[in-house]
């Protein structure tokens, strides 16, 4: 066994690894199955902020929002059994949104496993379908190794959640073990042949349409894609709830493909002769139930850029498949020699005009005019304001009429999970305290997570709800 920093409990070693991996905030509901870890977190309170939530779903939704905003794995901790079940909602959201997350779950003592002990759950079975990986740390001397693995898996390739089970007796074991190094994220770099193939498709296209979405973006990647679209006369649509990846005020913006998609935009998608899909999986919501793009071979030429090779060709067969991080592809696209034939200028102008026309309501409102509310918010809120949007029909107002202008100004679950907006807004205000945060939530979502307002008051988070 490697020697490290003297004898430490498994729980202390775990918290030490969190510090090493750059964790500054943890969202949790305390429970008796991980008391040793809680004690170590108390000792580390000057380095790691522990936010004690009112319900585990609130904790995992806050961790998911943190992961979206920062690009780093959000960290949640819940207790065994019922706590793990409550927390699964935010984990599922992280999986469908490709958000990096690590959730630590207390577990029964090792000598009580496989007896259906009090609150025992097999997390490999329960979490296996909604996590990239599920691991259990049975030996305290493996804590550095397996925690590092969890962060690496959560942040690499297609990001997503990893569940780590920590038996309560393992946390008390005393070990002398070396710490891990800070985890690193593996990113794929685009190659010259892939860019040559992409350029070849764009060169012969008269009606290209780019669709941006998914995870792995950065402010630089968004700026580079915008520069590419400008230089090459390509209209850009956003996949479901990803409008903040392209400035909605920009002349190349064509609107969102989702529940509030303009009929003219869906018609334009069908009319396009080339789809350049960057970061999006082309899921059900973006493709109108897989009806807007034919399966498995699209009627258009398809260039599909994604950070994980396993997703390319999984549903739609691309003509050009590019495995690359968003920053790598966007940078290469920006630097590519521009091709902007005059024939595409009108195509871009019409796409943007269709989007602007769709900002006008088609029905008169009775009572509160939500379109007018969105107009006021568009005028009054700064460009970097963060909007958190819950699930339900009401969310269509912010989806259709609010104009997102900067990267990471929208937090919304593509899984359609109700109860997200309030905890996400609380997390956003704690994570980015210099940015105003507005949460849109319906009566159902508010009933599901409204208790987290008490968490907001306790920790000084003050979003507008």
Residue ranges: model-predicted function:
Residues 149, 153-204, 357:
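Conformationally flexible catalytic loops at phosphate/diphosphate-handling active centers
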Residues 2-5, 177-178, 200, 299-395:
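Phosphate/pyrophosphate-binding active-site segments
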Residues 104, 113-114, 118-119, 259, ...:
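Thiamine diphosphate
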Residues 105-146, 168, 242-348:
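Glycine-rich, acidic loop regions that bind phosphate or pyrophosphate groups
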Residues 24-28, 48-51, 69-108, 211-214, ...:
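A short, small-residue-rich loop immediately preceding and capping a beta-strand
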Residues 13-23, 66-71, 95, 153-158, ...:
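Glycine-rich phosphate/diphosphate-binding loops that line cofactor/substrate pockets in enzymes
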Residues 11-15, 19-21, 32, 37-42, ...:
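Active-site diphosphate/adenylate-binding microenvironment
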Residues 68, 214-303, 403-435, 447-451:
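Glycine-rich, anion-gripping cofactor-binding loops and their flanking helix/strand elements
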């Amino acid at each position: 066994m490697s020697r490290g920093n003297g004898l430490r409990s498994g729980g202390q070693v775990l918290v030490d690894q969190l510090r090493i991996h750059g964790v500054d905030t943890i969202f949790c509901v305390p429970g008796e199955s991980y008391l040793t870890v809680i004690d170590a977190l108390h000792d580390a309170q000057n380095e790691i902020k522990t936010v004690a939530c009112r319900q585990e779903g609130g904790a995992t939704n806050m961790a998911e929002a943190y992961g979206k905003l920062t690009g780093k794995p959000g960290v949640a901790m819940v207790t065994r059994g019922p706590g793990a079940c409550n927390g699964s909602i935010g984990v599922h959201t992280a999986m469908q949104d490709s958000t990096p997350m690590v959730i630590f779950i207390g577990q029964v003592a090792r000598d009580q496993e496989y007896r259906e002990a009090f609150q025992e759950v097999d997390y490999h079975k329960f979490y296996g379908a909604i996590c990239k990986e599920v691991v259990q740390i049975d030996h305290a001397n493996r804590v550095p190794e397996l925690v590092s693995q969890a962060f690496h898996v959560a942040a690499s390739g297609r990001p997503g959640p990893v569940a780590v089970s920590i038996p309560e007796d393992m946390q008390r074991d005393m070990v002398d073990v070396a710490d891990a190094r800070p985890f690193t994220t593996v990113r794929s770099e685009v190659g010259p042949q892939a860019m040559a193939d992409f350029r070849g498709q764009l060169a012969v296209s008269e009606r290209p349409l780019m669709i941006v979405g998914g995870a792995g973006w950065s402010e630089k990647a968004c700026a580079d894609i915008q520069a590419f679209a400008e230089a090459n006369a390509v209209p850009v649509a956003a996949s479901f709830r990803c409008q903040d990846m392209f400035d909605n005020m920009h002349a190349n913006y064509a609107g969102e493909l989702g529940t509030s998609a303009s009929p003219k935009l869906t018609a334009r998608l069908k009319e396009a002769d080339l789809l350049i899909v960057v970061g999006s999986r082309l899921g059900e919501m973006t493709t109108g139930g897989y009806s807007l793009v034919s399966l498995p071979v699209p009627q258009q030429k398809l260039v599909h850029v994604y950070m994980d090779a396993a997703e390319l060709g999984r549903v739609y067969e691309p003509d050009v498949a590019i495995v690359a991080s968003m920053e790598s592809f966007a940078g290469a696209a920006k630097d590519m020699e521009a091709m902007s034939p005059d024939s595409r200028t009108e195509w871009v102008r019409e796409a943007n005009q269709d989007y602007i026309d769709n900002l006008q309501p088609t029905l008169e409102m009775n009572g509160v005019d939500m379109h007018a509310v969105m107009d006021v918010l568009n005028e009054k809120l700064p460009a970097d304001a963060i909007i958190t949007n819950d699930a339900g029909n009401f969310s269509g107002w912010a989806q259709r009429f609010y104009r997102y202008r900067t990267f990471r100004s929208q937090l919304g679950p593509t899984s359609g999970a109700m109860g997200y907006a309030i905890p996400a807004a609380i997390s956003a205000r704690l994570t980015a305290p210099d940015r105003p945060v507005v949460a849109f939530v319906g009566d159902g979502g508010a009933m599901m997570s409204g208790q987290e307002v008490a968490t907001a008051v306790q920790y000084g988070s003050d979003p507008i709800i």
